[in-house]
Amino acid sequence: AWSMCVWAASVLLSRWNIPVSCRVAINGTERPVDEHYGIHPKIYLLTERGMTEQGRDKFFARMLSGKEEMERFEENRPCRAIDEQRDELRLIREQSAREMPEMHWDRVYVSEEDVIFPVENQRNWWGNRVEIITLPGGHYPFYVLDNWEKIWK
């Protein structure tokens, strides 16, 4: 699970009792909107309220590491409506304040230059629960973890 989906996976897997052989968290925690363990609530709210075309472009630029990644990302840029993304951010904020699951994770990746989900907060959350594997780059790690074999090993 990546980013906010670490929290979402924790909610859904515990609710549906789905058997999973390996749980991998990438650049996220089970407390997505949290001053100490996730994205600071004030920053999150600014991101949510600033989700316009220009705001989304700024977010994507912060999510990626450098010009080369930005050029690659532009080739497969998500085509989602701004209102839909803003609603998703609002719902995650509201629901994550009510649903705070915790489950065992087998592997955790944290990108050393993640400015979306603060590295220190991710490390605070995971602590000694599981080994943290450090990746180069920013929040979007899929130019480093570019196939399933790299994620699982």
Q: Which residues fall in each region the model found?
A:
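Conserved alpha/beta-hydrolase catalytic His-Asp/Glu region
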Residues: 52-93
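Gly/Ala-rich beta-loop-alpha elbow adjacent to hydrolase catalytic centers
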Residues: 1-9
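Hydrophobic/aromatic beta-strand patches that form the interior of the parallel beta-sheet core
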Residues: 22-26, 107-109, 133
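Short beta-strand/loop motif that positions the catalytic acidic residue
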Residues: 102, 107-110, 114
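Short alpha-helix in the alpha/beta-hydrolase fold that links the catalytic acid
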Residues: 104, 117-128, 146-147
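Short, hydrophobic alpha-helix immediately C-terminal to the catalytic nucleophile
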Residues: 9-14, 119
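Flexible "cap/lid" loop of the alpha/beta hydrolase fold
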Residues: 14-50, 78, 87-93, 145
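Catalytic histidine-centered segment of alpha/beta-hydrolase-like enzymes
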Residues: 116, 132-152
